[in-house]
Amino acid sequence: MISKVLESILLDRLGKYINTRDNQFGFKPKHGTELCIYSLKEIVEMYRGQHSSVLIGVIDASKAFDRVNHQKLFTKLNQRGVPASIIRILAYWYANQSMQVRWGSSVSGPFSVANGVRQGGLLSPALFNLYMNDLSDQLNDCRTGCMIGNTVINHLMYADDLAILSPSSAGFQQLLNVCTEYGVRHDVQYNSNKSSVIICRAKGDKDLHFPQFYLSGEKLCVCYKVKYLGHFITDKMSDDDDILRQCRTLYAQANMLARKFHMCSDHVKICLFRAYCTPLYTAPLWGKFKKSSMHRLQVAYNDCFRILLKIPRWSSASELFVNAGVNTLQALWRNLMYRFIGCG
């Protein structure tokens, strides 16, 4: 508890020193994963509308929070003009921290930690964003990427989740080289097996050949879809795969609730359904999908409510939702979209 109070005070004192680039969406007010994904999709769709292909690289940094070099972090704080007294507090805190591992009833002996920001710390997200901000600066300095108005956008970040964008293969490889060099200097290790490239082709570029791309000397796999921030992005910018992901999530949540809370009253089950089954992550971003995919989601949403309340499948879904005071899928989706654009 005392450590959280101290971190809260330090975070308030550091606020004006640790502002990061607009490309970083993580742990910022009025930002989030959905806004980051939306920005990525809008950029790609704009370029495809102008008959230009776009290369997207989703880069995975292995245990990035655990690999932060303390000395380099404190150097960055000093370069930002952070008071020396605050840096000394952080340096002493990190140098003298120790951890223990609990496994069942066994507890290991204490051991020191030489790298990484504190797990669960209030200050840790801000320190990590600052640690990675120089990578954002170096990528922006490349001046290659997607031109939006008078601004070049070649990457988007949410904490350690990085996506790079470029309409040219040479520019794309240049961005990968910048990431590689930054990783070497700042102890950031990339996982090439979990990093991938998507080529969102324009209609006229269907037969165009693209070269191989390399990150940290390893060849990157070219995929037709990738999961970025929990949302499926495909080379055709279709949302069908993500809707099917949501169908699977709904059934998993409903079965879990039905199994664990089968003895509860219907009122409790309805509250649980609202809490676990109605968020529909990234639903406001769905704009390009087949009717059959949305029909499957409709069936899944209705089925899950019936499963939880132990009601036969042939019962009327619309009447069921009205009587329970729960939004239908169409009403829920509309409300989520209004909330996302700031009208709800």
Locations of regions flagged by a protein language model:
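Non-catalytic, peripheral interaction segments enriched in hydrophobic/basic residues
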Residues: 159-160, 191-196, 200-202, 225-344
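Short, conserved micro-motifs composed of acidic
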Residues: 105, 189-224
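Amphipathic alpha-helical segments in well-ordered regions
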Residues: 1, 5, 9, 13, ...
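Mobile genetic element proteins and their domesticated derivatives, centered on retroelements
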Residues: 6, 10, 14, 40, ...
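Active-site palm subdomain of RNA-directed nucleic acid polymerases
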Residues: 10-24, 127-159, 163-165
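Catalytic palm subdomain of template-directed nucleic-acid polymerases
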Residues: 64-80, 155-185, 201-204, 235-238
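Conserved pre-catalytic core of RNA-dependent polymerases
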Residues: 1-130
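Short, flexible turn/loop "capping" segments at secondary-structure junctions
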Residues: 49-51, 154-157, 224-225
